[in-house]
Amino acid sequence: MARFELQKLYIDGGYTDAGSDATFDAINPANGEVLAQVQRATKEDVERAVVSAEKGQKIWAAMTAMERSRILRRAVEILRERNDELAALETLDTGKAFSETKYVDIVTGADVLEYYAGLVPAIEGEQIPLRTTSFVYTRREPLGVVAGIGAWNYPIQIALWKSAPALAAGNAMIFKPSEVTSLTTLKLAEIYTEAGLPDGVFNVLTGSGREVGTWLTEHPRIEKVSFTGGTDTGKKVMASASSSSLKDVTMELGGKSPLIIFDDADLDRAADTAMMANFYSSGQVCTNGTRVFVPSHLKAAFEAKIAERVARIRIGNPEDENTNFGPLVSFPHMESVLGYIAKGKEEGARVLCGGERLTDGEFAKGAFVAPTVFTDCTDDMTIVREEIFGPVMAILTYETEEEVIRRANDTDFGLAAGLVTKDLNRAHRVIHQLEAGICWINAWGESDAKMPVGGYKQSGVGRENGISSLNNFTRIKSVQVELGDYASVF
């Protein structure tokens, strides 16, 4: 018996049945409990959502900037009023610790929505003089109907990161959450409607990426796709979006990011930074700094600091606010992470901490994997080359600055990078040479609403957050005005 009622699609301002009886289960990864059955959208449901979005978008775009801003601000207020309720649901659905979802997921998502709500009246064009009798002006106009496809690790936050700039710019969005974690996005749709968003401006279609995601990316009347997920899937989404109708895309994809500890770093700060870069959210963060480079002569001391901190991690029931490390998001993902851990052992990396599934007591019911640290790693190991998306840190040693920069950049990914040093000259010199879109100096992980987020190389295309994301949900129309005589050559 599921804990919650059947979860339906959200189209045209309310819940509606899908076109078929097919459903999938939402599972609590902490104990295997079925939380709810969730309907699978059909291709006909996608078309229904597009028609609804087209109708709603015209109403939304015709509102004044201040009217749109006020509605989005009201949604922010409701999100904050229901923070704990939404955080509790997010914890059940994802397995993330409530101590995290309560203070981060909804809070930072609401911050992004508030940021863009404030920018709505600032969307403006330019006036360009040509001569005394003529000038050009530009308009930033909404794209129309856009699609958002979310990942499972930050469900409601990602839905807000994508919908906030899209709605602020006057678009309608059809959002497909991950099949693994669909519940809070449906609640977000309710909140938008309650805040006054016209029907159809934010529709939610649940189902698989192979089906619903593909139908969205191929739809000829959807103007843009914003996707968060793995690189392999992102390539397919981008190919489908461009081949169907030359859609614009934003791709926030995978990473295998380097964290460089320099020899002048405070080792306690370095260890704290490495812990946050690897074990926050049970290691399921795309920007994690899983390749930790340490000077050879500091390796033993750094390992001791890390082992001490790993021993302090409070693993347990994610609903307990004292817990700061919960299960992985699903049992299939747990098996994937355990496979990488086995590969690390097989290829000769030494296990400093963890390295196994947790099965004692209540842990046996859930997808719990011990925080794992490998040392004596080399650049050619699978655990160093491939994104694991779990609580697995790889410690590597180096000798010179030039060497570590070269090795840090020796990857197909380029999402994030960071370093720890007391020398700010070195910090900026090195950061400017690292091939990554998001970088931190003496810290890791913070992504403010004003900070553009995105990757280099195979870690993505375009940016989320910041003013650039708002602009990317608009298109520019140029208009020339002639006040003088017009002479034809014919």
Swiss-Prot record:
One GO-annotated biological process of the protein: glycine betaine biosynthetic process from choline
Cofactor(s) listed: K(+)
Keyword check for Transport: no
Residues that coordinate or bind K(+) 1: 27, 93, 180
Listed CDD domains: ALDH_F9_TMBADH
Entry GO MF terms: betaine-aldehyde dehydrogenase (NAD+) activity; metal ion binding
Residues involved in NAD(+) binding: 150-152, 176-179, 230-233, 254, 286, 387
Domain of life: Bacteria
UniProt: K(+) 2 binding residues: 246, 457, 460
The enzyme's E.C. designation: 1.2.1.8
Cofactor note: Binds 2 potassium ions per subunit.
Annotated pathway: Amine and polyamine biosynthesis; betaine biosynthesis via choline pathway; betaine from betaine aldehyde: step 1/1
Keyword annotations from UniProtKB, A to Z: Metal-binding, NAD, NADP, Oxidation, Oxidoreductase, Potassium
Sequence similarity: Belongs to the aldehyde dehydrogenase family.
HAMAP family the record matches: BADH
Record's protein name: Betaine aldehyde dehydrogenase
Organism of origin: Pseudomonas fluorescens (strain ATCC BAA-477 / NRRL B-23932 / Pf-5)
